[in-house]
Amino acid sequence: MGTILDKIVNQKKKEVAALYETYTPVKEKRKTRSLVKALEQFTVIAEVKRASPSKGDINLHVDVRKQVKTYEECGAGAVSVLTDGQFFKGSFYDLQTAREESSIPLLCKDFIIDKIQIDRAYEAGADIILLIVAALTKEKLKELYSYVLEKGLEAIVEVHDEQELEIAIQLNPHVIGINNRNLKTFEVDLSQTEKLGKRLNEEKLLWISESGIHSKEDIIRVKRAGAKGVLVGEALMTSSSIHTFFEDCKVNI
């Protein structure tokens, strides 16, 4: 059967093959915006997320322009956009739309397995690329991280357990993302942030917490663990008051 992650990666291989047949990367360079700079103070990376394998449809018909504008007005330090179509109902068009609306750093949230996806994200306006350790071999991770640097972009290298963390640390990346969600089962455990955060604090690396953050209490918990930011999707996409969520994030620890 394979895990959810296996299914997603298999789908990505098909998409990459199709991209090589239909897409020619542009050579033009452009200015990019820095997440590292945004993380100088505690930052919310606010996500545009229409659906997910674990929750099904979340906010399928979201107005991307309006959502991104609200995020920026409320004080988001960056915006994350799901570009996976099959499992998350996103698209590169959503990323492009967000870029047209937003002046803050943009993260392309996808399952990146090939350089051509990075080219596509760059053209659509991404400043930051998510690289998921669980989805890549060590060699491929290193190759894609180098390519991110070559393009003048930043990377969030995502980990879920100790083994993945050690692989990520070897890269000395811009930012490490601790995903509280196990991508093999899609179960969430916020204690992963506390567990892995200790090691990252020792290494003095910049890191954020991702997934399962829904309340002021969750924000306090990850801040105490040493996170410099949070990536929040579902809670914001279903919130009746996005402004209140951002106010809760300003709590001092």
From Swiss-Prot:
User: A single GO molecular function, which one?
Assistant: indole-3-glycerol-phosphate synthase activity
Enzyme Commission no: 4.1.1.48
Task: Name the SUPFAM superfamilies on file.
Answer: Ribulose-phoshate binding barrel (SSF51366)
Family in the record: Belongs to the TrpC family.
Q: Which pathway does it operate in?
A: Amino-acid biosynthesis; L-tryptophan biosynthesis; L-tryptophan from chorismate: step 4/5
Looking up Gene3D superfamilies in the UniProt record yields: Aldolase class I
Task: Name the NCBIfam families on file.
Answer: PRK00278.1-3, PRK00278.2-4
Task: Look up keyword NAD and say if it applies.
Answer: no
Membrane spanning residue stretches? none
Q: Which UniProt keywords apply?
A: Amino-acid biosynthesis, Aromatic amino acid biosynthesis, Decarboxylase, Lyase, Tryptophan biosynthesis
Reaction catalyzed: 1-(2-carboxyphenylamino)-1-deoxy-D-ribulose 5-phosphate + H(+) = (1S,2R)-1-C-(indol-3-yl)glycerol 3-phosphate + CO2 + H2O
Q: What GO biological process, any one, is recorded here?
A: L-tryptophan biosynthetic process
* Protein name per UniProt: Indole-3-glycerol phosphate synthase
Q: Which organism is it from?
A: Bacillus anthracis
Top-level EC class: lyase
**Highest rank taxon of the organism:** Bacteria
